Regions:
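N-terminal pre-P-loop "Q-motif" helix
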Residues: 1-15
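Short glycine-rich substrate-engagement loop in P-loop NTPases that contacts/grips substrate
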Residues: 47-72, 88-89
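Conserved small helical "lid"/interfacial subdomain of P-loop NTPases
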Residues: 134-212
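Winged-helix-like regulatory helical subdomains adjacent to P-loop NTPase cores
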Residues: 210-217, 231-288
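Short amphipathic alpha-helical interaction segments
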Residues: 283-299, 304, 314
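Short, amphipathic alpha-helical interaction segments positioned at domain boundaries
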Residues: 315-330
Length: 330
């Protein structure tokens, strides 16, 4: 997965005997799964030369950032959005980190949450610090199918055990535009009408689509092409050597929410480990926070996994679309 992106990053790694200052690299994706997979692959390729720093779980402060790039190595700094999202005065830490990128000659590869990066791009023009920006796109249906089959069990049986609703539905899509000369990327939303499932293979109207194709199409629709979410749905749906339509989660639609609910969803989407205490730091009225979490759980959009609150798998795509429409993320 993302082989071409990994190869592109490796071409920018400084070779022995090359004394030029290597470009700083930013890897961006909507969820942590994709960028973690790519970071792991890069670290394996340059194993003896790499030092990794993950800002989502390791303690750090001003002193650690000032001494971060002392050793001769290739640095992979992961989840860099938590430099400013984790604590008061976080933007001071972020600026210190960015300044240290400019003042050292080390090879530095960073990973970022897509929504945090978009905010920093509008607020700080953060792309100025990174000559090489690698965006990990959502997978297409054929790419997602190939990835899941490679990771799944052999000899799986795909079974359609319920009547499928093949009605027309209105789908929001984005047309991506990149202006290389301005180092600018943006998307234009548009609406299209399509059937929920393809009962027949295009151009072969007399040949019905296989159950395997219909099930992968539903997984793709539920995950919006996000490989980490699709992999979780795929594995959870496998019972012994069968995967049935009824094993897949039901798609959700987001009801009209209060402003506080939208804010809570935004916090959960941004934080790597959104435990209750962290949400309470942003929303200090516990009664208001508890009421919002109750509404979100009741609608199936949010679940609690031990101490961590997270957006449900089937709720991720509609929640992201909902927040984009209200300009909470972009």
């Amino acid at each position: 997965m993302y082989e071409s992106k990994i190869c592109e990053i490796l071409t920018h790694i400084r070779k022995p005997g090359d004394f030029r200052t290597p470009p700083k690299i930013a890897i961006i994706s909507p969820t942590s799964y994709s960028r973690t997979v790519v970071a792991d692959s890069i670290a394996r390729e340059i194993s003896v030369l790499v030092k990794r720093k993950n800002f989502s779980g390791e303690p750090f402060g001003k002193r650690e950032l000032e001494n971060l790039f002392e050793e001769h190595a290739v640095y992979v700094c992961e989840e860099c959005q938590y430099l400013y999202e984790r604590r008061p005065h976080g933007f001071d830490l972020l600026r210190l980190f960015l300044s240290s990128l400019v003042t050292n000659s080390r090879q530095v590869i960073t990973t970022w949450n897509q929504y945090s990066w978009n905010f920093l791009s509008g607020f700080l023009h953060i792309e100025r610090w990174f000559p090489i920006i690698i965006t990990l796109p959502l997978l297409s249906l054929p790419e997602l199918k190939k990835y899941l089959i490679a990771d799944g069990k052999e000899n799986l049986h795909f079974i359609i055990d319920t009547e499928l609703d093949n009605s027309l539905e209105l789908v929001r899509k984005d047309y991506d535009i990149t202006i290389s000369s301005l180092n600018l990327s943006f998307s234009i939303p548009y609406l299209t009408v399509q059937r929920r499932y393809a009962s027949y293979i295009p151009l072969l109207a007399d040949k019905q689509a296989l159950p395997e194709e219909l099930i992968f199409r539903e997984i793709y629709r539920l995950s919006s092409g996000e490989p980490g979410i699709a992999l979780k749905i795929f594995h959870d749906a496998i019972v012994e050597d069968e995967i049935r339509v009824t094993h897949l989660p039901k798609p959700l639609s987001v009801p009209e929410l209060y402003a506080i609910d939208i804010f809570v969803l935004t916090l959960i989407l941004m934080y790597e480990l959104p435990v209750y205490s962290r949400l309470n730091e942003s929303i200090q009225d516990k009664a208001m926070l508890n009421s919002s979490l109750y509404r979100l759980v009741s609608s199936g959009l949010v679940i609690r996994n031990e101490e961590v609150w997270c957006i449900s798998l089937e709720g991720f795509a509609p929640v992201v679309d909902y927040l984009k429409q209200r300009r909470m993320i972009w």
